[in-house]
Swiss-Prot record:
<feature type="repeat" description="ANK 1">
    <location>
        <begin position="219"/>
        <end position="249"/>
    </location>
</feature>
<feature type="compositionally biased region" description="Low complexity">
    <location>
        <begin position="1"/>
        <end position="14"/>
    </location>
</feature>
<keyword id="KW-0677">Repeat</keyword>
<feature type="region of interest" description="Disordered">
    <location>
        <begin position="1"/>
        <end position="57"/>
    </location>
</feature>
<protein>
    <recommendedName>
        <fullName>Ankyrin repeat domain-containing protein 60</fullName>
    </recommendedName>
</protein>
<dbReference type="InterPro" id="IPR029071">
    <property type="entry name" value="Ubiquitin-like_domsf"/>
</dbReference>
<keyword id="KW-0040">ANK repeat</keyword>
<feature type="domain" description="Ubiquitin-like">
    <location>
        <begin position="96"/>
        <end position="172"/>
    </location>
</feature>
<feature type="compositionally biased region" description="Gly residues">
    <location>
        <begin position="15"/>
        <end position="26"/>
    </location>
</feature>
<dbReference type="InterPro" id="IPR039323">
    <property type="entry name" value="ANKRD_45/46/60"/>
</dbReference>
<dbReference type="InterPro" id="IPR036770">
    <property type="entry name" value="Ankyrin_rpt-contain_sf"/>
</dbReference>
<dbReference type="InterPro" id="IPR002110">
    <property type="entry name" value="Ankyrin_rpt"/>
</dbReference>
<dbReference type="InterPro" id="IPR000626">
    <property type="entry name" value="Ubiquitin-like_dom"/>
</dbReference>
<feature type="compositionally biased region" description="Low complexity">
    <location>
        <begin position="27"/>
        <end position="45"/>
    </location>
</feature>
<dbReference type="Pfam" id="PF12796">
    <property type="entry name" value="Ank_2"/>
</dbReference>
<feature type="repeat" description="ANK 2">
    <location>
        <begin position="252"/>
        <end position="281"/>
    </location>
</feature>
Length: 345
């Protein structure tokens, strides 16, 4: 063998040996599944101190998409532009329903707001339900009493939700209010509305003199207030004839004429005006019976009060007069003229 040929054979052998040595490095994981595990063990033996290479990589790689997804979700919520595009599901003004628990009646209250206080709601219910402000007890869901200075939002009251209205049970108020709601004079007569009544509660058992008089007059006023709101003509007439004052006021400064006007109770309005009620009395909000009737679109009641006030100013006192009857009939039938000519007999 010549020297050149032998040199060529040695070069070929060296190239083949290098290829074999490089083969395991590039293809060990494919040809030998346990190669990675063995290399991990060797790395641990050399003092790397970490977990196996295969297991660590398998946990770390899937975590990246989750982190990205979490980041994307946070950007959707926190990005001001994205948040402004989301619809506001809570309306600024909404409707509530209020159930008077003692009677089961349901009342619809419009124009409620999240920042509306419980006191403001009770002021509206004073007109709508006819229960004086100080006798109302409101509850929602958990049966806890709603405090006056809290808001509807504070109690998580939702649009269309039902709020329970209860009457305070102390001092016999529940029985009195229910009798006035029913409008039965015979029941009212037994519930301590006059000074000669034998009706007593645990609170009033020892009342005498002015204290007893004040207690009975207060109860007579509440009965008149509720009966006027409900339009019970016979009950209103009975109460007025037995000393109930149509000039007394509720804690909100309202008279029975205020609530009668709020409900458009024409017959009761006339009866109250006959007994000296004023259309110009203002409540704590500055509203008169006429302005309340106007705000609540009770046009007929508004006209009646204006007409009766003008007739009273003209000096006519007997409302049973024929001219008065004709005038009232024209108002009830929808007569729209603000001027009337009074012809002498």
């Amino acid at each position: 063998m010549t020297r050149g040929r032998a040199w060529g054979m040695r070069r070929a052998a060296a190239g083949a040996g290098g290829a074999r040595a490089a083969g395991p490095t590039g293809g060990a994981s494919r040809l030998h599944p346990n190669a990675g595990r063995r290399s991990g063990a060797r790395a641990g033996a050399q003092g790397c101190g970490g977990p196996r290479v295969g297991s660590a990589d398998s946990r770390a790689l899937p975590a990246q998409p989750l982190a990205c997804a979490r980041g994307r979700s946070q950007r959707l919520v926190c990005d001001p532009k994205a948040a402004s595009a989301l619809p506001d599901l809570a309306p600024d003004v909404f409707v509530l329903r209020v159930r008077l628990e003692e009677t089961g009646e349901m009342f619809r209250v419009a124009n409620c707001r999240g920042d509306m206080t419980v006191r403001e709601l009770k002021e509206e219910l004073d007109l709508m339900v006819g229960i004086p402000f100080n006798l109302q007890r409101l509850q929602y869901l958990d049966e806890g009493v709603l405090m006056d200075d809290t808001t509807l939002k504070f109690h998580d009251v939702v649009p269309g939700g039902i709020i329970s209205l209860c009457i305070w049970h102390h001092d016999g108020w529940t029985e009195l209010v229910l009798a006035a709601v029913e409008g039965d004079p015979s029941k009212l007569s037994c519930l301590g509305l006059t000074e000669d009544s034998f009706y007593r509660t645990a609170n009033s058992e020892h009342f005498e003199g002015e204290k007893w008089k004040h207690w009975t007059s207060q109860r007579a006023f509440v009965a008149l207030y509720v009966a006027s709101h409900r339009g019970h003509f016979d009950a209103v007439q009975y109460l007025l004839e037995h000393g109930a004052s149509c000039l007394s006021r509720s804690p909100l400064g309202r008279t029975p004429l205020h609530v009668a006007a709020a409900m458009g109770r024409s017959d009761c309005i006339i009866l109250l005006l006959q007994h000296g009620a004023s259309i110009h009395d203002r409540d704590a909000k500055g509203e008169t019976p006429i302005s309340i009737a106007h705000r609540l679109n009770h046009t007929l009641s508004e006209r009646q009060m204006v007409l009766l006030h003008r007739i009273a100013k003209s000096g006519i006192r007997d409302l049973n007069d024929l001219v008065m009857k004709n005038a009232l009939q024209r108002v009830k039938s929808g007569f729209r003229s603000e001027k009337m000519t009074m012809t002498p007999h």
